[in-house]
């Protein structure tokens, strides 16, 4: 069967607004989109996937939400009953968002095959969101259906471009949780708050040119990410997906924290006149640090940033 060379025309002019500079998808037209969100639980990874699904569904994609917790039906309607129902819905394209309940890799496999079959047959834009990615893809484990599920997800990643199939998947860590194929092919990365310093050795190469350090990741709050895209690296605060807004509890305002890292102090000092910075001698710094109840690490980072800023201005 002859096919025309696929052209991702839906990418041209499409955008993602994730809380920072809008990401234009024109530059992804030749590669497709493979997004990975990395961070511990409660970091906002699921919301990121739902936000992207809502935005892409409004721009011509059909989004398929793989839900291992059976929570998303209350937000987006009843889940499809079986793989055949998913096939039919993807072929008709009359529902912008479809929910698939799959509690483990074994349950995911027939739905994954259905997605691949429809993508290969019709080649119309589909966006798959896989929450709790470690349940369906593992770096080593192959038992209990994970091997077959991982192979299907790898095919999403490796052949998705030619089938108009785009992917978002979550990971708890940068190593040891997902097949390396996904990290090798990713082109949009969201890295959230990190508490484990041993994870930094794997993450550090991502930030080599941006001077971002582990302390910067450790200072992130839920919903904040460093976004690595074709446009570079940007710190963003992810908006809440529309469906979540209706059910999310009202958050209490959090008092603004003082800078904790060299980069945060440096950014804060950029806006302070030179004469005021020059007046911050050792005694003044000690007094202000005591009043603000700064930690020793905050004081050291602030002193280093102050010295660097003054040297830069002279």
Question: Where are the language model's segments positioned?
Answer:
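Conserved P-loop NTPase motor module
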Residues: 1-24, 31, 35-36, 139, ...
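A short, well-structured beta->alpha microelement
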Residues: 22, 77-92
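Walker A/P-loop NTP-binding active-site region of P-loop NTPases
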Residues: 43-84
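Short, glycine/polar-rich helix-capping loops at beta-to-alpha or helix-loop-helix junctions
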Residues: 72-75, 85, 174-181
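P-loop/Walker A phosphate-binding loop and immediately adjacent motor/lid segment at beta-alpha junctions
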Residues: 201-230
